[in-house]
From Swiss-Prot:
Keywords: Cytoplasm, DNA recombination. May be involved in recombination. Transmembrane segments: none annotated. Belongs to the RdgC family. It holds the Pfam family RdgC. One of its GO terms (cellular component) is cytoplasm. It comes from Yersinia enterocolitica serotype O:8 / biotype 1B (strain NCTC 13174 / 8081). InterPro entries: RdgC. It is found in: Cytoplasm, Nucleoid. This is Recombination-associated protein RdgC.
Amino acid sequence: MLWFKNLMVYRLSREVSLSADEMEKQLSAFSFTPCGSQDMAKTGWVSPMGSHSDALTHTVNGQIVICARKEEKILPSPVIKQELQAKIERLEGEQHRKLKKTEKDSLKDEVLHSLLPRAFSRFNQTFLWIDTVNDLIMVDAASAKRAEDTLALLRKSLGSLPVVPLTLENPIELTLTEWVRSKELPSGFALMDEAELKAILEDGGVIRCKKQDLFSDEIAVHIEAGKLVTKLALDWQERVQLVLSDDGSLKRLKFSDTLREQNEDIDQEDFAQRFDADFILMTSELAALIKNLIEALGGEAQH
């Protein structure tokens, strides 16, 4: 089981029926196929259980997990430039004239087509967890762009997907700043030793702290000077550690050994049973963490 490392959280903005059986059919039309000789990139769905299953969805207790795979061809620009330059020089020498821009552009396309079949591929996978009980979709992505790209593939596969980023009533950075300034955190949360502070004015600078006592006078001075806490490392109930950002994303999730060892008694050889047990454990913990965080940050914005 792949334990999520990041969470971008989205709210289903209206009632929508997401049944795993129906979704299985819809995703299969967009299942992953490798790049052909002239493809720069391809994206599609693969089984979240890897080689252990052909199913594109996996559901337990109203929680669905799916996985998108992307293949990208790697063509370093110096290589393209070198090939293109050689071609331009050869043609200009043969024709005794300088090539026009349109001719050079056309040559660049030719160079790309000739290089593509020989290019190496880079693969990445992005997991999505759909919580049909709480009407949330979580993407294991460190950037909003990667999350949005994966949701766009899901939207295309399902026909529609009414989701919006989870938004809170109060600006997150104001709440985080108040926690550090007052040295008081909501029940269940403890401050760790890492943060980012930004000046309200764009040219006012950024401070990134690691292994730092965030309740120290040094940090208090920055807050007094008008800097806001935009990232904060937190511990939740000694079970999950994370870095919370002012955009609502949770990064560098780390589950405690005690938590991860809860399913150690399950035979490692029984992949499906262990996958289910770990998925149930992870989603129940993260659902509780998200609920606690929303409350601690002042509640969800009412649209």
